């Protein structure tokens, strides 16, 4: 059974479809589902106990049915004579043979798994961010949709009692898939040096790994009771769970303090580990979809569904290989173009990952960054992350070469007709006529996904719909980031305290409490007024969070450094010194 697209571990999909509509609604919520399931289970349990106490003869009938049931003895080797007289087994048999109570039992099983998942996430990660909650909810709803289609194929020609084991198996796989997805998201966006809660993450990685191994042993134990087609599908599920759990376990090991002395080797290992795991999971999913497509009962909508997902999985594998080739070219360009130097101060940090610099690469603008940080940055933007100094990137050179190769040159030599001589000229015809009409080619869906992830990493408080709308207009992540920073799209100015403010008036109410120490400078060539605010030392820093205080202090420090530099000579001449 396939657990959605594992590419979502790296690149979240642009929200589309029914799963997104349900995922953004307030219903069904996990709390509401658990409360409703608890009420239904309580009513069903009370009904069963009342039925057993009001009709004592039902115990004798159930005991005879259990003694005549040979499937338990054949499949599990259980001695029926010893358990036939137990009231607990009689109740379980009664529930499993009732067409209504069995669905209540399955729903209670799903509710218990959902409650365990929520409890484990709460104990391990405390609170999830808004972006993580939305991504996890959409991935879970996509998994439910895929499971429904999957069950319609594997259980279509089978009897009702054979559907329940598949649903139990699907619940376990969904439980593991959701925990793996949330853990991978947290490992992706958390710095290795931030070891807060690392023990809890290590425990959950070991738990997921051992559960995946136990699932594999269980399938191998009961393989002889299954046909080869269902057994292969179950092994696909086990391999997917083992690969993802192994990836999480190795990421936790590589992020530990044991390997902190060599961060470049850790990044190199994590890159290849992620590439190999994603490609292996995509290949397993492709084979699983292919088997479901081939052995589906006739050509129907489910066949088209699996064929479509086969195409998506194949495209994901191609994109991963293409992205790997691009990163390889960029890394070779970094090694050949930018020298490797040591940081001037031992406490200097890379502004991309906020880790200690150590040995890093120096750009022409004299700013230093880690090899891997610079590679990931240049894959998105060909400029310095600090000063926006434009630097050459092999990605842009390749795109210019490709666009140049797609054009056709027509050369006309001048000829003489009587007394009239035609001039010689050259005409270049491009492969795309979009620029002729004043409109560039629109970005593809994959490019939009990559740019959306880039912007959301920097501004997680922004709405994905707002960012997508601006990306479709601007066509680049850099333009959208500039629009957000300059206040041209939906960013609340109260989120950036202590910075230069050219658009707000003096009487603007701030969400945070600041002392408005305002100086007004009349510029000779413009009638605009420049104001700024400074964090008040008497306003009570206890009301602000640690992050807000540190951010305001950092802005104040760099503002003073700028005023003391040569670039701020004009400001010092006006009397602005702090």
Swiss-Prot record:
Source species, domain of life: Eukaryota
Transmembrane segments: 32-52, 76-96, 101-121, 134-154, 163-183, 202-222, 230-250, 286-306
Glycosylation sites (chain numbering): 68, 492
InterPro entries from the UniProt entry: CUE, Znf_RING, Znf_RING/FYVE/PHD
Alphabetically ordered keywords of this record: Glycoprotein, Membrane, Metal-binding, Transmembrane, Transmembrane helix, Zinc, Zinc-finger
ZnF RING-type span: 350-388
The keyword Iron appears for this protein: no
One cellular component term from this protein's GO annotations in UniProt: endoplasmic reticulum
Residue intervals of the CUE domain: 447-489
Pfam families: CUE, zf-RING_2
Cell compartments where the protein resides: Membrane
Membrane topology designation: Multi-pass membrane protein
Any single GO BP term: protein K48-linked ubiquitination
Record carries keyword Glycoprotein: yes
Cross-referenced Gene3D superfamilies: DNA helicase RuvA subunit, C-terminal domain, Zinc/RING finger domain, C3HC4 (zinc finger)
Annotated signal peptide: none
GO molecular function: ubiquitin binding; ubiquitin protein ligase activity; zinc ion binding
Function: Proposed to have a role in neuroprotection.
Protein name: E3 ubiquitin-protein ligase hrd-like protein 1
Species of provenance: Caenorhabditis briggsae
Species lineage: Eukaryota, Metazoa, Ecdysozoa, Nematoda, Chromadorea
